[in-house]
Curated annotation (Swiss-Prot):
<protein>
    <recommendedName>
        <fullName>UPF0173 metal-dependent hydrolase Acid_3917</fullName>
    </recommendedName>
</protein>
<dbReference type="InterPro" id="IPR036866">
    <property type="entry name" value="RibonucZ/Hydroxyglut_hydro"/>
</dbReference>
<dbReference type="InterPro" id="IPR022877">
    <property type="entry name" value="UPF0173"/>
</dbReference>
<dbReference type="Pfam" id="PF12706">
    <property type="entry name" value="Lactamase_B_2"/>
</dbReference>
<dbReference type="InterPro" id="IPR001279">
    <property type="entry name" value="Metallo-B-lactamas"/>
</dbReference>
<keyword id="KW-0378">Hydrolase</keyword>
<comment type="similarity">
    <text>Belongs to the UPF0173 family.</text>
</comment>
<dbReference type="GO" id="GO:0016787">
    <property type="term" value="F:hydrolase activity"/>
</dbReference>
<dbReference type="InterPro" id="IPR050114">
    <property type="entry name" value="UPF0173_UPF0282_UlaG_hydrolase"/>
</dbReference>
């Protein structure tokens, strides 16, 4: 599978079959979005919560590519009101197959208000995702969150081999909390996200790497716009 970090909390996953998933799309106005990078296909969008830096380009991409859009029930309803045709609403603990990927929605510790024309709309709750790939490998995409003890249940239930965790601090957990998340999840690799986009997001991969020294988890720091194979 090809993974491309598109800056901040946005990722593109391209499966061997060709299915393309975009996680938490924020392109327009994203200072970390790689210059010259173009999205040419989207089959699936997964949205962890309704904040602008995770949902901003969901509607434009949906109208351009007509993908299936996975989100918690209330956020999916809001997207429908904006003209998104193919929503796949769900809630925590539920699973559904989207293309070739079985998607399970998990808990997250964060807020989820959607700013719409100057008002904050209730968007349900923030969530994470477990992605069960066709080759039986498992990804955990936490979305924005703090560490929570039930990450141990995510490990127990799903055994993710690759985890995507925010480390920026201020609006999410910092490397200090993310290090505990690594210990609870026991994934082989962790890809840090949601850091460095703005000056207050001070967490850095090297700090996380130092804090989990001795743990059998590799901190895999990606470069925006540069695809990697996993």
């Amino acid at each position: 599978m090809e993974i491309t970090w598109l800056g901040h909390g946005t990722f593109q996953f391209r499966l061997p079959s060709g299915q393309v998933l975009v996680m938490d799309p924020w392109i327009d106005g994203n200072p970390a979005y790689p210059k010259g990078c173009k999205i040419d296909r989207v089959d699936t969008i997964c949205i962890s919560h309704g904040h602008f830096d995770h949902i901003h380009d969901a509607v434009p991409l949906a109208k351009q590519f007509d993908p299936e859009v996975v989100a918690i029930f209330e956020t999916a309803h809001w997207l429908e009101s904006k003209g998104v045709a193919k929503t796949r609403p769900m809630n925590k603990g539920g699973s559904q197959k989207v293309g070739e990927v079985m998607v399970t929605m998990t808990h997250a510790v964060h807020s989820c208000g959607i700013v719409d024309e100057g008002k904050i709309i209730y968007g349900g709750e923030a969530a994470g995702y477990v992605l069960h790939l066709p080759d039986k490998r498992v990804i955990y995409f936490s979305g924005d969150t703090n560490v929570f003890s039930d990450m141990a249940l995510i490990e127990q239930l799903y055994h993710p081999e690759l985890a995507f965790l925010p480390i920026g601090d201020l609006y999410t957990m910092s490397p200090h909390e993310a290090a505990l998340a690594c210990r609870l999840l026991r994934a082989r690799k962790v890809i840090p996200m949601h850091f460095g986009t703005f000056p207050p997001l001070t967490g850095r991969p090297d700090d996380l790497r130092e804090r989990i020294r001795g743990l059998e988890t590799e901190v895999w720091a990606l470069e925006p716009g540069k695809p990697v194979q996993w």
